């Protein structure tokens, strides 16, 4: 009899990509897969491109750490989502639920617990996010990406697994990436990306620095939806994308160095690909500070250069990029020492062993 798994997670691409990595492997092992996400989150778009994975949506509320009148309404949306998730899980009868986190995951984990279905939570960041903190007491197992996270998760449910990286990222073609961007191959390539939602600060500083940077690099700029600067379309050596999906492996293969936010999934993918990186973590004013901890951990290990968001200027950004490129061989050498275990297989085995 075929086993069934419910996957959940959303809000940003980082809360979906581990699920995307799991789906082909789960299919190979004969699992039936169902996805529960939010009505309008980015997960709906990403999972909608994958054949054979039915998508259901539930109500949810954002878990804010600041005052907003929606804070009074959203708990009722979460309760509604718990009821919807409970009914969906009751109907689908999965053997296990796997959560990548994000606010949509809370009702789904609670719905699984109410149905007596085991669940596994995956925590990417060094310290747990608010949604995962709420869901952890109701989960069967908690998978960790950083070994240091055990200090912040006071439970024997926690298991260090490591970072799960999408297999297709390892098989990109630099030549295909070069054709896509129409670069001539005469300069090293800088890839800049500000996360699935984009980053105005990074976008603005990078564009202001183009006269300096284009003398040294060809630049691929993944700027976020609605953030393409039409005045720069056609600029030689500068290619903008709002968001990429199938093209990403080729663009990564093409790139010599990368400027990125410090979301855990993204930086571990860059580590697996041995890409020297300049990390610009989200500031504490705009987040809970998890990206700062992620970035500092990579800086300490010698994998990355770090530039704090409040330090980003039209002068500091190109200087940091130049410094990264000058030291790229040292960063690559440090990355080679990071090991080559297979967290994806470890996670698949844990899911198999935890399922009822």
From Swiss-Prot:
A biological process from GO: lipid glycosylation
Entry binding sites for UDP-N-acetyl-alpha-D-glucosamine: 12-14, 166, 196, 291
One GO MF term attached to the UniProt entry: undecaprenyldiphospho-muramoylpentapeptide beta-N-acetylglucosaminyltransferase activity
Catalytic function, reaction form: di-trans,octa-cis-undecaprenyl diphospho-N-acetyl-alpha-D-muramoyl-L-alanyl-D-glutamyl-meso-2,6-diaminopimeloyl-D-alanyl-D-alanine + UDP-N-acetyl-alpha-D-glucosamine = di-trans,octa-cis-undecaprenyl diphospho-[N-acetyl-alpha-D-glucosaminyl-(1->4)]-N-acetyl-alpha-D-muramoyl-L-alanyl-D-glutamyl-meso-2,6-diaminopimeloyl-D-alanyl-D-alanine + UDP + H(+)
Entry-linked InterPro entries: GlcNAc_MurG (IPR006009), Glyco_trans_28_C (IPR007235), GlycoTrans_28_N (IPR004276)
Compartments, record wording: Cell membrane
Pathway given in the UniProt record: Cell wall biogenesis; peptidoglycan biosynthesis
One Pfam family in the UniProt entry: Glyco_tran_28_C
EC nos: 2.4.1.227
Membrane topology, record value: Peripheral membrane protein
Keywords per UniProt: Cell cycle, Cell division, Cell membrane, Cell shape, Cell wall biogenesis/degradation, Glycosyltransferase, Membrane, Peptidoglycan synthesis, Transferase
Entries under SUPFAM superfamilies matching the protein: UDP-Glycosyltransferase/glycogen phosphorylase (SSF53756)
NCBIfam families named in the record: murG, PRK12446.1
Protein family: Belongs to the glycosyltransferase 28 family. MurG subfamily.
Protein name: UDP-N-acetylglucosamine--N-acetylmuramyl-(pentapeptide) pyrophosphoryl-undecaprenol N-acetylglucosamine transferase
Gene: murG
């Amino acid at each position: 009899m075929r086993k069934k798994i419910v996957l959940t997670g959303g809000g940003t691409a980082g809360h979906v990509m581990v699920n995307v990595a799991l789906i082909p492997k789960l299919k190979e092992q004969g699992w039936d897969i169902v996805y529960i996400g939010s009505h309008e989150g980015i997960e709906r778009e990403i999972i909608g491109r994958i054949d054979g994975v039915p998508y259901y949506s539930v109500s949810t509320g954002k878990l804010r750490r600041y005052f907003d009148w929606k804070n009074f309404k959203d708990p009722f949306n979460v309760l509604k989502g718990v009821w919807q998730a409970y009914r969906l899980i009751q109907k689908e009868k999965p053997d296990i639920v796997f959560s990548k986190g994000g606010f949509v995951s809370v009702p789904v984990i609670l719905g699984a617990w109410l149905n007596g279905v085991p669940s596994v939570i995956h925590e990417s960041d060094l310290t747990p996010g608010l949604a995962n903190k709420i869901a952890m007491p109701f989960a069967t197992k908690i998978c960790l990406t950083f070994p240091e996270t055990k200090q912040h998760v006071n439970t024997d449910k926690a298991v260090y697994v490591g970072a799960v990286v999408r297999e297709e990222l390892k098989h990109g073609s630099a030549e295909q990436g070069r054709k896509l961007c129409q670069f001539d191959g005469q300069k090293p390539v800088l890839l800049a990306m500000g996360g699935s939602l984009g980053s105005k600060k990074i976008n603005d500083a990078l564009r202001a620095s183009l006269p300096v940077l284009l003398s040294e690099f060809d630049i691929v700029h993944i700027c976020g939806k609605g953030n393409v600067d039409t005045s720069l379309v056609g600029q030689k050596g500068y290619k903008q994308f709002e968001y990429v999906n199938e093209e990403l492996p080729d663009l990564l293969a093409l790139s010599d160095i990368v400027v990125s936010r410090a979301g855990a999934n993204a930086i571990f993918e860059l580590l697996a690909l041995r890409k020297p990186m300049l990390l610009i973590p989200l500031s504490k004013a705009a987040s809970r500070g998890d990206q700062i901890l992620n970035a500092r951990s990579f800086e300490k290990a010698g994998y990355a250069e770090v530039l704090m968001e409040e330090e980003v200027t039209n002068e500091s950004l190109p200087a940091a990029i130049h410094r990264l490129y000058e030291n790229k061989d040292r960063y690559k050498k440090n990355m080679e020492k990071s090991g080559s275990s297979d967290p994806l297989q470890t996670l698949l085995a844990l899911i198999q062993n935890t399922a009822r």
